[in-house]
Amino acid sequence: ATIDPAVLFIDRCLQLLKPGGRLLIVLPDGILCNSGDRYVREYIMGKKDEKTGEFVGGKAIVKAVISLPSDCFKLSGTGAKTSILYLQKRHANPNQPEQFLPEPQTDVFMAVAETLGYVVKNNIEDYNAGVANDLDKIVSAYKRGE
């Protein structure tokens, strides 16, 4: 069976993080919402316990998901819809370093960036077009806990 390279990349990023380390990664939206990629979400967050509603066994806590504009990577030749995923690696159990401590998945901050501070004209990014960068407002809202 073939494995999506994005999945291998996520796995490697999590391996390289120290316990408690943070990761911001741009991913295709399919990984975040396609039913066929559920195993990726369960690998990251763990499986949801139907009784408690808690996620058990995951490698990371999802802190935020920020949806990016569909034309964000247009100049690189892709029209794939993407999002920024912000994760924090769970802390290792001191008695069993290969196991993670059962840290609760907190509420996930979610936002949509409609503009990134530029427009594409004649295959060139124009940053002087007077377009706002929604990421500034989104980061401020995250820091305020909104």
What is each PLM-predicted segment?
Residues 1-146:
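A conserved structural/catalytic subdomain of Rossmann-like adenosyl-cofactor enzymes
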